[in-house]
Structures are given as C-alpha cells and as structure tokens.
Design a protein with these regions (language model features):
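N-terminal loops that bind phosphate or other acidic moieties
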Residues: 1-210
Length: 210
C-alpha cells in the first residue's frame, strides 16, 4: 500500500470511528453544548468518503484536502471550520510528497494544531480540541526521532487520550460550553474526544497496514 492509499485507508477508518462513536460524542456534547457534534462529525466524514470517490486523489495531500473541503461544507457548528482548517493545513504541510516520513507525520499534526489554534484562538486549558491536539503534536514530534510513522501516530493518540481526559475538571473558556461557567466542569470535552478518536483511528490503520 502506497502513502496515498494508506492516507485514504486512514480516512475510511476515521469515518467508521465517527459513525461508531456518534452517540458517545452526542452525549458528551449534549452535556455542555448543542448536542450535535456526533451527528455533525459522522455526516462530515461520510461526505469526505463520497468526495474521495469522485476526486481520485494522487497524493496524500490530495486526500487530506478532499477531507477538508467536505468537513467545511458539511459539518455545522464550530467543528466544521476547525477540523476543515486542520486537514487543509495538514495537506499544505505535505505539499506534493508521495511518501510520508516520521518527520512528515509529526509535521502534519503540528500543522493541524496551528490551524485550529489560529482559527479558534484557544490554548491548552480552555477545554477544547487543543487540550488533546497540542500534547499529541508534542508527543508526535518527540516520537519522530525514532523514524517510525506508526510510532508517531501511536504516541500522538496516547497523548490525545490523556489530553481529552484532562478536560473533565476544566471550566470551558471557549465556545458554547463557556456560557455554562462552572456547570461545564465535570464533563469531558467532545471536540477533544473526537480528536483522540481520529488520531487513534490513524494509528490503528497504519499499524495494520505496515
């Protein structure tokens, strides 16, 4: 499997995971938000698969750009622009590369983080996607030195899981959840959770295909 096929396989698994966890994400979002995160992410990744069926991508970046366009056009709320920007920045970071090194993989995650932070103006501790994605990017960068793409995503996913769990006691400072004040405490952030699930899907897919 070449890098383009592998990237597509990752997106297919991400779509499957978003469908499988739709109710979980909806439950988490119902506690502190609009309750639509699960359905929105599921719809967005289904649209991404449809776009890939017609786009015929020739590089990993083409795959990521197609996902970006689908998420921006199909996912409502804050998640669409945020995740759409993340995938677009990841695509730009890869350029026209046909193969992906461990360093490239870490750069992709770092680029996604940069896009989300710029778009959402959030930092660690605000109870958002960033609480999962920033530690993931840091872990990915550290793991890249071992030269193993799977290891990069495995480290990123593990750090993102811890980051998502760390949002439980936090008081939300961004988005709709911030309107709840102290009532947002005691709940895991749905965006941080979906970030972990997406990175875990990538790690498992690449591990299975390596």
């Amino acid at each position: 499997m070449d890098a383009t096929q592998a990237t597509r396989a990752v997106v297919e698994e991400m779509a499957s995971v978003m469908e499988e966890n739709r109710r979980l994400l909806t439950k988490l979002d119902s506690e502190i938000g609009d309750g639509d995160h699960g359905n929105n992410m599921n719809r967005g990744f289904k649209a991404a698969l449809e776009r890939l069926d017609t786009a015929d991508p020739s590089t990993p970046a083409d795959v990521l750009k197609a996902v970006s366009m689908a998420l921006i056009s199909k996912v409502g709320g804050a998640a669409g622009p945020l995740y759409g920007t993340a995938f677009l920045r990841a695509s730009t970071a890869l350029g026209d590369r046909e193969e992906i090194s461990a360093e490239d993989a870490a750069e992709v995650i770092e680029a996604a983080l940069g896009g989300i932070k710029q778009r959402g103006k959030a930092e660690v501790g605000d109870k958002t996607i960033v609480d999962a994605l920033q530690p993931a990017a840091e872990a990915a960068k550290e793991a890249a030195g071992e030269g193993n793409v799977v290891g990069v995503f495995r480290a990123a996913a593990a750090a993102a899981e811890e980051g998502a769990e760390s949002t439980v006691p936090l008081r939300a400072r961004k988005g709709r959840a911030s309107y709840l004040g102290a009532r947002s405490e005691g709940h895991q952030d749905p965006g941080a959770t979906s970030t972990y699930l997406l990175l875990d899907a990538a790690a498992r897919t690449l591990e299975g295909g390596s």
